[in-house]
Curated annotation (Swiss-Prot):
Zn(2+) 1 binds at residues 53, 55, 145, 298. This is Dihydroorotase. Pathway: Pyrimidine metabolism; UMP biosynthesis via de novo pathway; (S)-dihydroorotate from bicarbonate: step 3/3. One of its GO terms (cellular component) is cytoplasm. Gene3D superfamilies: Metal-dependent hydrolases, Urease, subunit C, domain 1. Its cofactor is Zn(2+). It comes from the Bacteria. Zn(2+) 2 binds at residues 145, 172, 225. The lineage of its organism: Bacteria, Thermotogati, Deinococcota, Deinococci, Deinococcales. InterPro entries: Amidohydro-rel (IPR006680), DHOase (IPR004722), DHOase/Allantoinase_Hydrolase (IPR050138), Dihydroorotase_CS (IPR002195), Metal-dep_hydrolase_composite (IPR011059), Metal_Hydrolase (IPR032466). Catalyzes the reversible cyclization of carbamoyl aspartate to dihydroorotate. Its EC number is 3.5.2.3. CDD domains: DHOase_IIa.
Length: 416
C-alpha cells in the first residue's frame, strides 16, 4: 500500500513538503506523488503520539469504553500507540487475555494496542502474576494501577521479577490510609466546601517509599500522574541519586485545579485529585527542565450516569484522549515550544519503555500525525469517538487538532 501526504511542514520548518509511505514504512520526502494522496492542508507532520496510561475498560466494563471506541478516540487524538491499564473485569493477568486483546485491536484499524498486565493476580496485592508468560504474550508493562501497591514486600518482589525480564513497573502512588475518603485535594478549598480531602502527603509519602524500594532492588520504576510539587522533588532527588526512575504528568493536573470542585461537579473528580495552581505550575517547570519524562492522559471513561452522582459516590476519572494534544498546545505550547511538547508525547514515552525513538526519516515505521496548529475549534464532546461524550473542556476553543493519523502505514483517522 502506498500513500503520499502533500502540503505538510516538518516541526520547526515553514517549508511545504510531501512524504511518501510504502508498505508500512516511510519511503522518503518530496518524491513524485504516488498511491493514495492526502492533502495535509498546511499542517505540521509529527510522529504519532504514544500514550502510556489509558483505561479502555475491556473486558468487563464496555458500557464505559471498549477497544473500538477507545482506540478510535486515540487515533482521533493523534495517537499511534496506546498502553491500556489492566484494571478491567477480569483483570488483565492472564497471557491468553493479553493475546486476545492484541489480536482484536489489530483488526480494528485504529491505534496500536500494547497491553499492560497486572503485577499481582486480580490486582489483589498478594500473589505475583506469571510475568514471564505475560511478557511472552505481549504485555509491555506491569502495573496494579487503580490500586496502590500497599504491600511493600510484594512490590519489591514484583520489581525484582520485572527487572529479571528487563521490564518496567508503573505505580499509582498514593497511601490508601492517608487518602481514605478524600474526594478532592485537602486544603482551603476542600475546607470551605466541607468536603473530605485527600492530602498531598498521601502521594508524596508513597512516592518516597517506592524510591527506597527502587534503591533496594535496582529495578526500573515509572511513577504515574504526578500531582504535587513534593512528589516531583522526591523524584528529582531519586534521579540525582542515579536511580532508574521515570515519571509522567497528565494535562488535567496542569490545566485544572481544585478550584474546579467549587461547582460540586464530579466530572472534576480524579485520582489523584486536582491540586493547587502552585502544584500545577511546579509540575510544568518539571516538564521544562526535563525532570518529568513524558505526558500521559490517564484516559479514564465512565458513564454519564456515574459521573452525575454525588461527589462522594461518583467514580474518579476524566476521559479526553482525543483532545489531549490540543489542550497542551493551546495552554502550554508557548511555554514548552512545539519540539519539546512533541518530544514529551512521543520520544519521551518511548524512552520510558525502552522503545526506539520515533523517526520521520526514510525507512522508519510509518506512524505519524498531521496537526493543525493554527485553527481554533470549539470542543464538542458529541463528536468524540469515545463513549464518554462529556468533558471539562466542553465549549472551550483549542488549537492543535489532528487532521490525519497514520499507523503502520495505514490511515487510522482522517478529519472530515
Amino acid at each position: 500500500m502506498t500513500i503520499t501526504i502533500t502540503n505538510i511542514k516538518r516541526v520547526g520548518s515553514e517549508q511545504t513538503e510531501s512524504l511518501t509511505i510504502e508498505n508500512g514504512l516511510i519511503k522518503g520526502w518530496n518524491l513524485p506523488a504516488e498511491g493514495e494522496i492526502f492533502d495535509g492542508q498546511g499542517g505540521t507532520l509529527a510522529p504519532a503520539l504514544i500514550e502510556l496510561h489509558a483505561h479502555l475498560r475491556e473486558p468487563g466494563q464496555t458500557e464505559k469504553e471498549d477497544l473500538a471506541s477507545g482506540l478510535a478516540a486515540a487515533s482521533a487524538g493523534g495517537y499511534g500507540t496506546v498502553v491500556c491499564m489492566p484494571n478491567t473485569r477480569p483483570v488483565i493477568d492472564d497471557p491468553a487475555l493479553v493475546r486476545s486483546l492484541i489480536e482484536k485491536a489489530r483488526g480494528l484499524g485504529f491505534a496500536r494496542l500494547r497491553p499492560a498486565a497486572a503485577v499481582t493476580k486480580g490486582e489483589k496485592g498478594e500473589q505475583l502474576t506469571e510475568m514471564s508468560y505475560l511478557k511472552e504474550a505481549g504485555a509491555v508493562m506491569f502495573t496494579d494501577d487503580g490500586l496502590t501497591n500497599e504491600n511493600a514486600r510484594v512490590l519489591r518482589l514484583g520489581m525484582e521479577y520485572a527487572k529479571s525480564l528487563g521490564m518496567v513497573i508503573s505505580v499509582h502512588a498514593e497511601d490508601d490510609a492517608l487518602r481514605a475518603g478524600g474526594v478532592m485535594n485537602e486544603g482551603p478549598v476542600s475546607e470551605s466546601l466541607g468536603l473530605p480531602g485527600n492530602p498531598a502527603a498521601a502521594a508524596a509519602a508513597r512516592v518516597a517509599r517506592d524510591m527506597e524500594i527502587v534503591a533496594l532492588t535496582g529495578a526500573r520504576l515509572h511513577v504515574q500522574h504526578l500531582s504535587t510539587a513534593r512528589e516531583l522533588d522526591i523524584v528529582r532527588d531519586a534521579k540525582r541519586r542515579g536511580l532508574p526512575v521515570t515519571c509522567e504528568v497528565c494535562p488535567h493536573h496542569l490545566d485544572l485545579t481544585d478550584e474546579s470542585l467549587r461547582t460540586f461537579d464530579a466530572m472534576y473528580k480524579v485520582a489523584p485529585p486536582l491540586r493547587t495552581r502552585a502544584d500545577a505550575d511546579y509540575l510544568l517547570e518539571g516538564l521544562l527542565d526535563g525532570s518529568v519524562d513524558c505526558i500521559a492522559t490517564d484516559h479514564a471513561p465512565h458513564t454519564r450516569a456515574e459521573k452525575e452522582r454525588d461527589l462522594l459516590d461518583a467514580p474518579s476519572g476524566i476521559a479526553y484522549i482525543e483532545i489531549a494534544f490540543p489542550i497542551m498546545w493551546t495552554r502550554f505550547g508557548e511555554r514548552l515550544g512545539l519540539e519539546k511538547l512533541i518530544d514529551l508525547m512521543t520520544a519521551g514515552p518511548a524512552r520510558v519503555m525502552g522503545w526506539p525513538e520515533p523517526s520521520l526519516e526514510a525507512g522508519a515505521p510509518a506512524d505519524m500525525v498531521v496537526l493543525d496548529l493554527e485553527t481554533e475549534r470549539e470542543v464538542n464532546p458529541a463528536e468524540f469517538k469515545s463513549k464518554a461524550k462529556f468533558t471539562p473542556w466542553q465549549g472551550q476553543k483549542l488549537r492543535g487538532f489532528p487532521l490525519l493519523t497514520v499507523v503502520d502505514g495505514k490511515v487510522a483517522y482522517r478529519r472530515e
